[in-house]
């Protein structure tokens, strides 16, 4: 059992430490009486989980990339603990984020998650579900890549919920991508039949909508002593990379260097070269096009960094920051030119 001293803000960049939080009371984590726990146990910490989509490890300034500016992710690095040897186990199809999120949520390995993570059965507890069962208010916003029933078992409330893998292409509305996500409000029945397209003319962005929901939850619970767990799952920097000028910094391809392991075309067919990711640019890859794609990718990372900063600032303003454990992670990485690839359906370092 870990005893967290939260007088000074404690931040973690990986999940294992969070799962050792003593819940207190009649929890299986301790055998003391309820009276003893109330008198002797520290105040139970809040937990904020921030999850980005397709963000490779080398896109954080504090970890040595001087081409990108990520001041709020840097705050987490500089004030917390970084786990630099964690890897994604891949997947059984092209949607790597689906099993990776299911693995993170359940603690199970790739071959043990149900249907590649598409469904999380009742007998496979998620960590938000465990927190909820032990008295935490659990809140979810953003991407949920498994079934709706598992979401409702995990969270007692939520807002701006995106069920699915990515903001798709196809028709005029969908091609606006992050500017026009299809979102749901929390439905206690679990049916979620009344989702709505966000009006693209509002010139908002998916990350802002998820941050707005998180900020509103913090504001609403500022005076509430009951501990909470927040799960904020961004859909950025996953493509389509149509970030608006007002959201973060726009990078110029002239500012970006090509990765040393860039080649114009992968030397052999690994079985996944026809995935949608790999069709974003034609092969053989033209260096100028890859640099432009990397510049857009960096812009998306910077955009989500701005929204993370808004959440951290509100947490501090609420006075909850000194008793909140923050976990920041990505579901998987991404190749953006490395080895001639543009996807994550491989086991190269940038993708895992």
Language-model features and meaning:
Residues 2-13:
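Bacterial N-terminal signal peptides that target proteins for export
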Residues 13-24:
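Bacterial N-terminal signal peptides
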């Amino acid at each position: 059992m870990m005893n967290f001293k939260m007088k000074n803000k404690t931040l973690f960049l990986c999940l294992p430490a969070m799962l050792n939080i003593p819940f207190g009371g009649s929890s299986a984590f301790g055998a003391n009486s309820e009276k003893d726990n109330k008198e002797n146990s520290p105040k139970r910490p809040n937990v904020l989980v921030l999850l980005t989509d397709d963000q490779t490890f080398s896109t954080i300034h504090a970890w040595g990339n001087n081409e990108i500016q990520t001041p709020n992710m840097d705050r987490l690095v500089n004030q917390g603990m970084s786990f630099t040897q964690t890897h994604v186990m891949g997947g059984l199809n092209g949607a790597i984020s689906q099993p990776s999120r299911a693995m993170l949520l359940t603690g199970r390995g790739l071959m043990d998650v149900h249907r590649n993570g598409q469904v999380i059965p009742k007998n496979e507890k998620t960590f938000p579900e465990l927190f909820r069962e032990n008295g935490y208010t659990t809140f979810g916003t953003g991407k949920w890549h498994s079934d709706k029933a598992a979401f409702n078992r995990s969270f007692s409330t939520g807002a701006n919920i995106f069920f699915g893998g990515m903001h798709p292409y196809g028709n005029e509305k969908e091609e606006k991508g992050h500017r026009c996500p299809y979102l749901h409000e929390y439905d206690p029945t679990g049916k979620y039949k009344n989702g709505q397209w966000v009006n693209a003319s509002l010139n908002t962005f998916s990350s802002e909508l998820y941050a707005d929901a998180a900020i509103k939850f913090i504001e609403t619970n500022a005076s509430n002593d009951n501990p909470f767990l927040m799960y904020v799952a961004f859909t950025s920097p996953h493509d389509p990379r149509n970030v608006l000028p007002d959201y973060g910094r726009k990078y110029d391809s002239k500012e970006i260097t090509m990765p040393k392991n860039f080649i114009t075309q992968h030397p052999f067919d690994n079985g996944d070269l026809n995935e949608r990711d790999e069709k974003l640019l034609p092969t053989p890859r033209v260096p100028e096009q890859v640099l432009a794609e990397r510049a857009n990718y960096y812009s998306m990372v910077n955009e989500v960094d701005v929204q993370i900063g808004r959440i951290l600032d509100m947490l501090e303003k609420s006075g909850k920051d000194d008793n909140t454990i923050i976990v920041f992670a990505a579901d998987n990485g991404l190749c953006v030119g490395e080895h001639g690839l543009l996807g994550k359906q491989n086991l190269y370092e940038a993708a895992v």
